[in-house]
UniProtKB/Swiss-Prot annotation:
Zn(2+) binds at residues 51, 54, 88, 91. This is Splicing factor YJU2. Belongs to the CWC16 family. YJU2 subfamily. A motif (Nuclear localization signal) lies at residues 242-258, 260-278. The gene is YJU2. Present with 2250 molecules/cell in log phase SD medium.
Length: 278
């Protein structure tokens, strides 16, 4: 019987362990990259879809174990296009969709229907089918090349006139600074003018208020005197004329006399001073 674990192994005379390691690594790389076009991956659905067999709703961003397949077609002969296939979680129907690098989107192929298809208002039939025609690609490439050439020419001209550009920028900055200073001066002047106008208006209002108060006082005094005159000059009010003053200096003028020294008695006998009755 042979040994289960062989201890003695045959090594040929031309055996080199370094070369054997290199060969094993190369074979491992070949085995890994042998079926690179077909690979099983873990993916998430990029949009919501519906299965055509069982009408199962598959939401967006749901995880699946699917397969990735590299197609022979290429967008603009440089960008690769991949086909992704998943199975329906209810009926195991295969659903396939592929990448669309022209519109930065995905296109449904087999087994399902996309629930919502975003469409632009000015899209053509080719754009709706997410396939760009050869003429359109050529026109777009020509436009892109023209734009690149124009940009390069503009950059060259700018490189030739760098000093002029710097001078223009400096002049522009200086002009902006001068404009800012002028604006600040105008703002200060406007503030001063507005403050002066406010002071003048306040003084005018104060003078007007003073004049109004003096006029009101004069009017009140005149009104009081007028009312008093009207009361005194009424026709039925003659009491002042009938009244006589208590003291009339004109009536007693020249009539004041001294008291006589002669005394009288009720019997009619005159009695003089210094004499007595016998």
């Amino acid at each position: 019987m042979s040994e289960r674990k062989a201890i003695n192994k045959y090594y040929p005379p031309d055996y080199n362990p370094l070369e054997a390691e290199k060969l094993s690594r190369k074979m491992a790389k070949k085995l890994k990259t042998m079926n690179k076009s077909h690979a099983s991956i873990r993916l998430m659905t990029p949009f919501s879809m519906r299965c055509l067999e069982c009408n199962e709703y598959i939401p967006k961003s749901r995880k699946f174990n699917g397969k990735k397949e590299l197609l022979k077609e290429k967008y603009l002969d440089s960008i690769k296009i991949y086909r992704l296939t998943i199975s329906c979680p209810r009926c195991a129907n295969s659903i396939a969709f592929r990448t669309d690098p022209g519109n930065s989107d995905y296109v449904m192929e087999v087994g399902g229907v996309r629930n919502y298809v975003p469409q632009k208002p000015n899209d053509d039939l080719n754009a709706k089918t997410a396939v760009e025609s050869i003429d359109e690609t050529l026109q777009r490439l020509v436009r892109e090349k023209e734009m690149e050439q124009n940009e390069k020419m503009g950059i060259k001209e700018q490189a030739d006139d760098k000093m002029d550009l710097l001078e223009k920028r400096l002049a522009k900055i200086q002009q902006e600074q001068e404009d800012d200073e002028e604006l600040e001066n105008l703002r200060k002047k406007n503030l001063e003018m507005s403050q002066r106008a406010e002071m003048i208006n306040r003084s005018k209002h104060a003078q007007q208020e003073k004049a109004v108060t003096t006029d009101d006082l004069d009017n009140l005094v005149d009104q009081v005197f007028d009312n008093h005159r009207q009361r005194t000059n009424k026709p039925g009010n003659n009491n002042d004329e009938k009244r006589t003053p208590l003291f009339n200096p004109t009536s007693t003028k020249g009539k004041i006399q001294k008291k006589s020294s002669v005394r009288t008695n009720p019997l009619g006998i005159v009695i003089k001073r210094g004499k007595s009755l016998k």
